């Protein structure tokens, strides 16, 4: 059954029951906050299965998926090559706690694709990757302070939750309770796309900043690309001040090109973090970079990092299969599909006289209800975000599943076809009208 009603929850009775049940044993009923529909209201959809571009919930509703598991599913769901790789790996053992050849192959694939990355360490999540990269940067430089950007999200690492995007943006929190003052004191936060602020921070903290960490292109305040020269400027400022540049490509890595954002702008970081696409949809991530920096990582060096399930053979098999299947044809399809979605969104919102900007960062995109370009977090928050819940439910109730937050990027998959875009095109006029009719609280 495909959703066709304008009522956001009319066909969600089983999801509602499961959400109530989940809330009894899981905080907030979900295992990652944005899934709770906190900023859009209504009942979170509990998913039964997925194939290609289609999600099917427990009530039997089908949706064109524009979340793609928050980025990993560039091939679409249940891609045969990935499923076969997982099944084959699982028959030989689920976890060994010892090295495997697959770990080497996955690391080699990452090194082959991203030239500045000379060595790689596999971990289980993007949060682990960024946490470990920052620790390594501190150990390598002997410095303590970290510079990050307002609205950029680097996982739920204590030191990096200050003024973050993603889930914290959804909840309107500048940071999280439980993050100590001492941790916050070592984190310097400046506006995204503002090189003058970065230069001023270095001047005010001379010899103290271990690293600058940035999303290679921001996706957790919505899709906000670096302005021309911004990443290049970060490279110059970090090099001139003896700090490392950490490029967080958990979101952009292997999605916006076969070499991630590095493949688009060619700016070489000292360290990189990866996740999502390289995981094939299973829990896996990585960090890597210059060989001389990575040489400080245990057991080769003194900076400790470890993980029981790091390099898990089933996750490694999924990631390797996903990367190997992502040939140029896949990236061409992602470009086409992103461009088509962008046009459909803008045409529908223009027809409904809704102020908007459909912004892209590579093949990621976001809808901002603003007439002005969004280049940083403050501008993202200044948009008419109160229009988003009506727009979201206008799409969801008609078989299209966008991210349930105005501050998250939208993702396409290579599996999307004319039928998928026909469903989107049919859903958009009423959703755009709902956004136009929304009333500011």
Curated annotation (Swiss-Prot):
It catalyses: (S)-4-amino-5-oxopentanoate = 5-aminolevulinate. The gene is hemL. The modification N6-(pyridoxal phosphate)lysine is found at residue 276. Pfam families: Aminotran_3 (PF00202). It is found in: Cytoplasm. Keywords: Cytoplasm, Isomerase, Porphyrin biosynthesis, Pyridoxal phosphate. Pathway: Porphyrin-containing compound metabolism; protoporphyrin-IX biosynthesis; 5-aminolevulinate from L-glutamyl-tRNA(Glu): step 2/2. This is Glutamate-1-semialdehyde 2,1-aminomutase. It comes from Rhodococcus opacus (strain B4). GO terms for biological process: protoporphyrinogen IX biosynthetic process. GO terms for molecular function: glutamate-1-semialdehyde 2,1-aminomutase activity; pyridoxal phosphate binding; transaminase activity. Its cofactor is pyridoxal 5'-phosphate. NCBIfam families: hemL, PRK00062.1. The lineage of its organism: Bacteria, Bacillati, Actinomycetota, Actinomycetes, Mycobacteriales. It comes from the Bacteria. It is an enzyme of class 5 (isomerase).
